From Swiss-Prot:
Lineage, highest ranks first: Bacteria, Pseudomonadati, Pseudomonadota, Gammaproteobacteria, Enterobacterales
Entry's Gene Ontology molecular function annotations: acetyl-CoA C-acyltransferase activity
Keyword Lipid metabolism: yes
Gene Ontology terms describing biological process: fatty acid beta-oxidation; phenylacetate catabolic process
Keywords: Acyltransferase, Cytoplasm, Fatty acid metabolism, Lipid degradation, Lipid metabolism, Transferase
Cysteines joined through disulfide linkages: none
Name of the coding gene: fadA
Protein name per the record: 3-ketoacyl-CoA thiolase
Coiled-coil portions: none
Reactions this protein catalyses: an acyl-CoA + acetyl-CoA = a 3-oxoacyl-CoA + CoA
Major localization class: cytoplasm
Biological role: Catalyzes the final step of fatty acid oxidation in which acetyl-CoA is released and the CoA ester of a fatty acid two carbons shorter is formed.
């Protein structure tokens, strides 16, 4: 079976969804820009030799509808002979895109693929057009479809206090701001043109949503966002609303060698699991455990972790039950996470994987694990190994 390697990985800056830098930029343009950028950064790859494009997107309607993967590929002027498909596993969509492409390569159906994902949450809100089947109420609580309330449930079950959530949220912003200041995101961000507050076209090469001034004290002043009476989860301890895209160029190991391309890492294992929708945020725990089992590794073998921060209230129980609380500042979300950078749904899996690869290289870690929760009760994880 072919080994799957990551040759390159990039992302856009994360733009603020409400009146932010990308308010006049469409999701297809963000996607096409990254497709073009990957190919221009790797000129030995003939676009016509791409076997497929797998692109994650959750809200597949309006500008994100009608197979945005193909629309973006056409905008990027990739040859018409190259197919493209849009993948939807809610929050795990672009990581699922990576898994789908990797399997195609493993079994010999592909040699070179572009994968990635996008979500413009300013143009297509998360709840746009959602219409759950009434019959679901017989099996699933209505609150299970309300992500903030599932986070509240996990906080109660695991004894995660409001103060713990606010401290973790402040850490996310502080670490993301420090990473930006130190230039640690420069290796992964590809500049994109957007518009400033006055509508003037501007080149953006840094994330717009990070709030460096965030403190525990400022977060403690916020009201609960989902349970106004007994809640502990606030807007400040939830992932920010942002717009963005991320992408990777992946190949079989033999194809990369044939083209003289240096592989940054290989996929060691992949896993997807289901869990109770009422605690959907717990999905990273069983997903990570299964991915580690398939890789023949233990949690101690992993040098760096990226765990998507949908909510501090769900991230902390996962960190606790994975046995990482005492390693938090050594191994977990070292450049901050989605609380600071935002969680553009279809983008995030590729985004955290891209950030993980750069952290693995910077810290000379052999193994890294990226994992995320998924709405309605799933988890997804990928173990990467540097080559």
């Amino acid at each position: 079976m072919e080994k799957v390697v990551i040759v390159d990985a990039i992302r856009t800056p994360m733009g603020r969804s409400k009146g932010g830098a990308f308010r006049h930029v469409r999701a297809e343009d963000l996607s096409a820009h990254l497709m073009r950028s990957l190919l221009s950064r790797n000129p030995s790859v003939d676009p016509a030799t791409l076997d497929d494009i797998y692109w994650g997107c959750v809200q597949q309607t309006l500008e994100q509808g009608f197979n945005i993967a193909r629309n973006a590929a056409l905008l990027a002027e990739i040859p018409h002979s190259v197919p493209a498909t849009t993948v939807n596993r809610l929050c795990g969509s672009s990581m699922q895109a990576l898994h789908d492409a990797a399997r195609a390569i493993m079994v010999g159906d592909a040699r070179t693929c572009l994968i990635g994902g996008v979500e413009h949450m300013g143009h297509v809100p998360m709840s746009h057009g959602v219409d759950f089947h009434p019959g679901l109420s017989r099996n699933v609580a209505k609150a299970a479809g309300m992500m903030g309330l599932t986070a509240e449930m996990l906080a109660r079950m695991h004894g995660i206090s409001r103060e713990m959530q606010d401290r973790f949220a402040a850490r996310s912003h502080q670490r993301a701001a420090a990473a930006t200041q130190a230039g640690h995101f420069a290796a992964e961000i590809v500049a994109v043109c957007g518009h400033d507050a006055d509508g003037v076209l501007k080149r953006y090469d840094a994330d717009e949503v990070i709030r460096p001034e965030t403190t525990v004290e400022s977060l403690m002043a916020l009201r609960p966002a989902f349970d106004p009476v007994d809640g502990t989860v606030t807007a400040g301890s939830s992932s920010a609303l942002s717009d963005g895209a991320a992408a990777m160029l992946i190949m079989s190991g033999s194809q990369a060698r044939q083209q003289g391309l240096k592989a940054r890492a290989r996929i060691r294992s992949m896993a997807v699991v289901g869990c109770d929708p009422s605690i959907m945020g717990y999905g990273p725990v069983p997903a990570s455990q299964l991915a580690l089992k398939r890789a023949g590794l233990s949690i101690a073998d992993i040098g760096v972790f990226e765990l998507n921060e949908a909510f501090a209230a769900q991230t902390l129980p996962c960190i606790k039950d994975l046995g990482l609380m005492d390693k938090l500042d050594e191994k977990v979300n070292l450049n901050g996470g989605a609380i600071a950078l935002g969680h553009p749904l279809g983008c995030s899996g590729a985004r955290i994987s891209t950030t993980l690869l750069n952290l693995m290289e910077r810290r000379d870690a052999q193994f890294g694990l990226a994992t995320m929760c998924i709405g309605l009760g799933q988890g997804i994880a990928t173990v990467f190994e540097r080559i």
